[in-house]
Amino acid sequence: MICSLVLVSSAGSIRAAEMPASKEYLNSIGMKLVRIEPGSFQMGQLETLGPNVLPVFRGRGLFDSLKNGDYDEKLIHTVKINNPFYMSEFEVTNFQYELFRPEHRALRGRNGFSSKDDEAVVFVNWYDATAFCRWLSDKDRLEYRLPTEAEWEYACRAATTTNFHTGDVLTQPFLKKITVGGLGINPADLTVGQTPANAWGLYDMHGNVEEWCYDWYGPYVKGIQADPVGYARSDFRVTRGGSVGSDMYYLRSANRLGAIPETRNWITGFRVVLGELPKSRPLKQPLRRYQQNVVTRSREQVTKGPDPDKPYFMGPLRYVNIRQGSVGPTYSSHNHCPAIVECPNGDLLTVWYTCHDEHGRELAQAASRLRPGRKQWEEASLFFWTPDRNNHSPALWYDDDNEKLYHFAAVSIARNRGKSVLAMRTSRDSGATWSPPRLIVPEFDGGRLPSEPVIRTNDGTIVVGVDGRHKGTELWASHDEGLTWYNPGAEIMGVHGGVVQISDGRLFVMTRNAAIDGKMPISLSSDGGKSFTSIASDFPPIGGGQRLALLKLRTGELFFASFTSEGGDGIFITDATGNRREIKGLFAALSLDDGRTWPYRRLVTDDGPARTIECTDGGCITMSARRSEYRGYLSVCQSLDGLIHLISSRNHYSFNRRWLMTKPPAPVDKPVRVRPIVETFDGPEKFDSPGWHEYKGPVGHFNGSGQYTIESGSHYNGINHIVRAGSFEATYELKNIHYNPSGSRPTEGVTVGFRDPLSTGHPTIFVFIKENALDSRTGVKVALSSPPKSATMKFVYNEKVPQWRIFYGLDGAEPTTELGQPFKVKNPTSEAIAAYVLMSNGSVDLDRFEIKPVH
């Protein structure tokens, strides 16, 4: 072993000691480092993953769609490491770090993590880690630093090509620190060196704590890379290795993670390398679709719009445009929780979350633009994603005073959204580029999910509402243009709060998941949010899958949009003929007196004949003068031309104040009755019956054998079709039912049935195929190792009773076996009822579907 020496030249200057050359090196603070020799390796996920490695899908089976790894690992490429370096055999410990910063001792044991000397240090951000490296470099006169991402994976693999340096799976004692579906929040022992070292003598490369790397995060590039150092700039620094409390999937050698550099938490630490930083040129980030061709337009161009004195309505226009079967960086499965803003150049910018599972680590934020004069939203592109962190709830705001766009986002510590921080960034070029994200609420805690609108109060304070820690809404405010933030103190009843300031200076908030006397609450504060008084509105409360929108218009009125209760009663309006009638679904309202009364109310529809549209994730709904979307998260903005732009979880509507204040016409048609449907699934390119819609983005295709194949790698992927009101018999014929290897875990499997969200008191009628029977219990999970090869199901609905009877036959049998007793329901179905065929983690061939009206 070569000792660290300080050599003094004849001129009296001090130069660094020479690099060691032995296999191991013990430095001045007792840290042992092992020598990593030059070489090359294949970087990225190399093997197909087995079911024992895949992450769990919220108790519903596994993510089979991730069997080839995350999308950011799939560009496998050769990396050459041309120079030797030393890497610490363990992660930096509390004892070692506190030689540099003794005050860190106060953080030991916080949240139940890392209290002992020999546990990995946590609650250190990227800047803390690099500062430690500089301190140690000055102390030893040697160059210590963080490893590059390529060096880290090269050293972790230690010449292996398997999922882990142990092989295709992790073995004991690694499994002691793995939590299936884990959140990374349960206290754990972080003592270093408790698991076996890899072939090169490095410990804890799979689990214990995540480790900061030198690189800015970015996409892999093609071709051979020599000593890569990542990107010149990004929003995130790379972390590697995974942590305690994680699924095995996130501990793989190839798995990439990242974090905002200022992040401090209980699952992230670091290890050091000794050696000169490679002199490779960092890469430049490619422009994403939403960043391209962003032009400047004059205010005169932007303010031109429809005649404000004539009613104007447009929609629905789909803004979620993602290709079928997409598994990253955008996902076709689940798209929800949007935000919308008009950019200074007149572009409309939408941002929403995109994922398989809203609790998953893959959940990212996507974006799309609608350029002035265009009739179609652009293809979605990745907008914001902290790698392998759930990035929930975007909020957008344009600050007219400072001509600046704001973007707020919740960033989880891992999966789920229960422990999050609140990040903010800004743009001065219509969202083409953004400032580095900054943690404005930096402590990981419950809630932190921002909602809209973001407002500036009369005294200049910026206010944003977030879901609080106790199932309520908190306000966070800034008096210094977003530099520092504080919570005024009160927690408001209900979540997803919309906040405005009314003319007398009070804050006015409306929320979800709360009710007063069976109505949505209004909460009012006259002290800047320190306390609130709540009263009942005259609108119905809303629940899961629904979010209201609230906005103070440029002309001073309050705009409100929400939904009638799913499966409940509607609200009443008076149309242009003087007829008072019930409407159900998405509606908008206008108040001229700060929310005391809402004299103008309209169903958000074009008032035309009944037609099928898609709502959240592609679920079918009948839009008419009586019905509109039944659920979704809403966001609203008003553009400079006066138009109000309202979006749900899938669609964009625009209308003006005059339309909202004009009484709707009488319906042009009567509720549509059920019609015959015969679908053979012969293809080869189109369905026999128009009106089938994808639900949650399956991979579906006509297979050339007279069938339509649905392939699913996640949960509830399939197709649906509007049936409409009336008595009918429905027959489903399914063949070649196949479950992916993870089908041995409980999952919904094949799900068939009907859903009518706009019929009061009418439940969803779904059945699930088990090995030798059907099951109709809500949310049933079946563990199928050998599903039936085929199934035929007949649903008989009688609207006069009203009731359902369900018959089935498996493996070629006729559908003569009745499933339990008839299902009696409260009310008849509506024109919005839809038939569903869904698959979770597997594939099924649809052979025939038929609807016969019964008179």
Regions found by a protein language model. Give the residues of each.
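A short glycine-rich, aromatic-capped structural motif
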Residues: 25-107, 127, 207
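Extracellular, beta-strand-rich glycan-interacting domains
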Residues: 87, 93, 206, 273-276, ...
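Short, structured beta-strand segments at or near domain termini in extracellular proteins/domains
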Residues: 265-280
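Boundary at the C-terminal end of the N-terminal hydrophobic targeting segment
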Residues: 14-16
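Functional-site microenvironments in short loops/helix caps that host divalent-cation chemistry
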Residues: 42, 55-69, 106-253
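Extracellular glycan-recognition regions
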Residues: 669-855
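Asp-box/BNR beta-propeller blade signature and adjacent active/binding-site loops
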Residues: 284-673
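Bacterial N-terminal signal peptides
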Residues: 1-9
